């Protein structure tokens, strides 16, 4: 495993390769619309198929990651991503583009699942997930700034994703194989029951709707900026890059705040504010209003997302809920482009924004309730320590940090487990001899005198 004070760069890189397709969704869907004989709704459906394939990989692998290890699935996922997205970027035949996008989505979803599982098992998972969000946001911002100057070809965003997968491949050699157990699962059986059977499904369903609302707007943001707000292609790329840069600041702010606000307030209040940002962006008719809505929205989105990742990871130190909730989020993300296209076609962009904002206000309540339920009574800092002497209460208090092998801040103490000893106790005193030297052939007994 990686050294405690060393950033797990292979996981960060794998996280980046897996999460890049959703970040590039607006330009991917927009270029499919303009560069291929597809309608806006059909282009959104291709984007949804890509992300649905990614979510499917997460659901299929969620319960198998500990047995498969990280190295082999990561390499397979990166290979599929490179081949699928690469092929889709090099052809203009619509069936081949769709097939390549679906194959690439399966690969990026596999990479995302491996990264989520291993990050949840890290001693400091918040640090790893924060670095991953920072890296993918920076890379996506660079793509948004660069791609408009390279032409109008539909395959440029897809090629960027394929090349990222290729660049990450050499780092997979540092990932553990199937024989290496995760730190959080050390000492636990492979058949331990899934905890959080009430909170987990509620959180997964709410996060699915949360992601659906976010990505319904994100999938049509490019068209809103071009057709309703009056931006050019290059100016739109700058707005997206600045918005993702603001998201970097949001992630850093979340890391700095850590446990000070708990999880309930960032998740609940953050979602309410995001609802307002979505309504503002969808109704924008000027470049200034559109840019303000996009930047504010993208500043808050990764903040709330980091707390949701941590909330899911805290439900199970083996990372199973982190993967399942992440896959539910991917399902919402997958349905986003098609949902946004259909809603905007039926109700217009402002009407779509109001519907999505209302959905976010509805799901804010159950997500906040799960965060409050997971919080509970705080532990005294330093009362329990992890290996290495770090106070567990302080480690678990960090935003997005699952409890691992010790209770999380606010969680009840773990029960004491009775351990069965194979060797039975000696039943009679006659089995003992008196202290002192014994003759070699003497039988044990109570001794003379």
Where are these regions (language model features)?
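Short amphipathic helix-loop junctions that connect adjacent transmembrane helices
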Residues: 26-42, 219-235, 310
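Cytoplasmic helix-loop-helix junction between adjacent transmembrane helices
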Residues: 94, 100-135
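Intracellular juxtamembrane helix-capping segments at the cytosolic ends
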Residues: 109-123, 302-317
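A late C-terminal transmembrane helix in Major Facilitator Superfamily
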Residues: 19, 315-357
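Helix-to-loop junctions at the C-terminal end of transmembrane segments
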Residues: 56-72, 120, 249-263, 344
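Structural signature of the two symmetry-related core transmembrane helices
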Residues: 72-86, 265-280, 354-357
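C-terminal transmembrane helical hairpin of 12-TM major facilitator-type secondary transporters
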Residues: 261-308
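Helix-loop-helix hairpin linking two adjacent transmembrane segments in secondary transporters
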Residues: 122-126, 130-177
